[in-house]
Amino acid sequence: MKTFSAKPHEVKHEWFVVDATDKVLGRLAAAIAHRLRGKHKPIYTPHVDTGDYIVVINVDKLRVTGNKAEDKIYYRHSGYPGGLYETTFKKMHARFPARPLEKAVKGMLPKGPLGYAMIKKLKIYAGDIHPHAAQQPQSLEINA
C-alpha cells in the first residue's frame, strides 16, 4: 500500500470563526497554527497546504498570563545602526490589537512559501464584526 499524498486541487479548505475573548495568547496561537497547517486532518501532507481558513474575532479581549503584559518585549530593527525598537505587549496590544496574535501564529508556522500561504489564511479582527459572512464560517471553540 502506497503512502497517501494529498494533491493541492483535492484539498477542501473550510472556514472557521474563533472568538478570542479571555483566551490566552500562546495557547490560542498554537491551536490556530495547528489548524492553519492542516494537521487535524487525516489527509495532512507536509508539502501541501491542507489547512483551513481561520477568522479570529474579539482579539482586543485577548490576555496573557502573569506579568507578560509588562514584561514581554517585541523587538524590531529599522536596518540602521542603533535602530532597535522595543515594544511591550501592553503597548502593542493597545495600538495594534491583532499584531501579537499574528506574530505568535506566524512564529509557529513553517518559514518559506508554504508558510506564507498558510498565514494568509488567518484573518484577525479586533471587534466581533468581520466581512467573511459570505463564506459561512463555522464556529470553532478552542479551549485555551
UniProtKB/Swiss-Prot annotation:
Assembly with partners or alone: Part of the 50S ribosomal subunit.
Gene: rplM
Keyword set includes Ribosomal protein: yes
Coiled coil: none
Function: This protein is one of the early assembly proteins of the 50S ribosomal subunit, although it is not seen to bind rRNA by itself. It is important during the early stages of 50S assembly.
Annotated Gene Ontology cellular component terms: cytosolic large ribosomal subunit
Taxon lineage: Bacteria, Pseudomonadati, Pseudomonadota, Betaproteobacteria, Nitrosomonadales
Gene Ontology terms, MF aspect: mRNA binding; structural constituent of ribosome
Native organism: Nitrosomonas eutropha (strain DSM 101675 / C91 / Nm57)
PANTHER family from the UniProt entry: LARGE RIBOSOMAL SUBUNIT PROTEIN UL13M (PTHR11545:SF2), RIBOSOMAL PROTEIN L13 (PTHR11545)
Keyword Ribosomal protein listed: yes
Gene3D superfamilies from the UniProt entry: Ribosomal protein L13 (3.90.1180.10)
Family designation: Belongs to the universal ribosomal protein uL13 family.
A UniProt-annotated Pfam family: Ribosomal_L13
Protein name: Large ribosomal subunit protein uL13
InterPro entries per UniProt: Ribosomal_uL13, Ribosomal_uL13_bac-type, Ribosomal_uL13_sf
NCBIfam families: rplM_bact (TIGR01066)
One GO biological process term: translation
Record keywords, A-Z: Ribonucleoprotein, Ribosomal protein
